Regions:
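Hydrophobic helical membrane-anchoring modules
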Residues: 2, 170-171, 175-308
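Active-site acidic short loop of glycosyltransferases
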Residues: 3-4, 32, 55, 77-80, ...
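Cell-envelope/extracellular polymer assembly enzymes that use nucleotide-activated donors
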Residues: 5-7, 34, 178
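Short, well-formed alpha-helical segments that are part of the catalytic scaffolds
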Residues: 14-28
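Donor nucleotide-sugar binding loop of glycosyltransferases
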Residues: 15-18, 42, 92
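A conserved acidic beta->alpha catalytic loop
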Residues: 39-47
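Acceptor/aglycone-binding surface of glycosyltransferases and processive sugar-polymer synthases
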Residues: 61-76, 81, 93-173, 177, ...
Length: 308
């Protein structure tokens, strides 16, 4: 791996308490790597401390949010392998070399540092975070036919191909969810390795808002489900409307058979419109599914060409 270019990516917002240790840990484990600290409008000494360490590249991203930071990192940095971690010292750098090896020698496109199979539920004392991780994992694996153990971990390794073909739309913490879904949809090579998670040191505060960011993650899942599985998404909506419309129509039709009169014109009109709406939704889902399949084929061909 010594002839390969490795980049360590550390997005940071107010991490003055931990950033020096995190940087030095990664320098120790991957001395050949270039370490990039992206400061995201920190109001403390994060950028100053990182810049004081020899060999560290410090850049600023003024658009607030982790997704904005990672988008800029992916656009601006070229490397054979990318290691991404948080600047809060919750992910041990000792796993970084093995993660890089799996990208460079085993042709993995994404190596996920799986916290949930090791110490996460013991170290993390925030019950709603634990519940949220389980819920997101269940949703994504069900909706996108995956088998990922840790969807929202911030500790990952990427190939050059994945980084340059990943269209990041998210602005905030939902970016990890977006990357995982995109990797599943485009059939990138994915693997997971257990990593020892440790809670933030005393005095270090999490930037994650459990409710607000949790809702963003759930919204991202359903937005991407609509975009990547339109036939299923619109088909389900169509089925619901068709059943409702049919129930209303049949009630009017049965009355007509009994009395030879249409006694409830408003119900008939609503039922007919509902059934028509269900047909339109089904047709839309079918058309979008054809478009998405073609787009997916083009993306896979592009990946194949790059891998040559």
């Amino acid at each position: 791996m010594t002839d390969k270019k490795i980049a360590v990516l550390l997005p940071c917002y107010n991490e003055e308490q931990t950033i020096e240790k995190v940087v030095r840990d990664f320098k120790r484990e991957l001395p050949e790597a270039t370490i990039y600290v992206y400061n995201n409008n920190s109001t403390d000494r994060t950028a100053e401390i990182a810049a004081s360490i020899e060999g560290v590249v410090v850049r600023n991203e003024y658009r607030q949010g982790k997704g904005n930071v990672i988008r800029s990192m992916f656009r601006q940095i070229d490397a054979d392998c990318y290691i991404m971690a948080d600047g809060d010292d919750t992910y041990p750098a000792e796993h970084a070399r093995e993660m890089a090896r799996m990208v460079l020698e085993e042709n993995m496109d994404m190596v996920i540092g799986d916290r949930l199979s090791s110490t996460y539920f013991v170290e993390n004392k925030r019950a709603f975070h634990n519940f949220g991780n389980r819920l997101v994992r269940w949703l994504i694996n069900k909706l996108f036919a995956g088998n990922i153990k840790d969807i929202m971990t911030g500790y990952r390794a990427f190939s050059y191909d994945f980084v340059k073909l990943m269209p990041i739309e998210s602005n905030g913490f939902e970016v990890e969810t977006e990357m995982t879904i995109n990797a599943l949809d485009k059939k990138f090579n994915i693997c997971e390795i257990p990593v020892q998670y440790r809670d933030r040191p005393e005095g270090s505060v999490s930037k994650l808002n459990t409710v607000k960011d949790g809702m963003r993650v759930i919204g991202t899942i359903f937005r991407m489900f609509k975009n990547y599985r339109p036939m299923v998404f619109f088909g389900l909506l169509s089925a619901v409307l068709f059943v409702l419309g049919s129930v209303g129509f049949m009630s009017v039709f049965i009355e007509y058979l009994q009395t030879h009169l249409v006694l409830r014109f408003p119900t008939l009109i609503v039922a007919t419109v509902t059934i028509l709406a269900s047909i339109i939704l089904f047709s839309s889902g079918l058309i979008l599914d054809i478009i998405i399949r073609k787009h997916r084929q083009n993306a896979l061909l592009q990946i194949n060409c790059i891998k040559k």
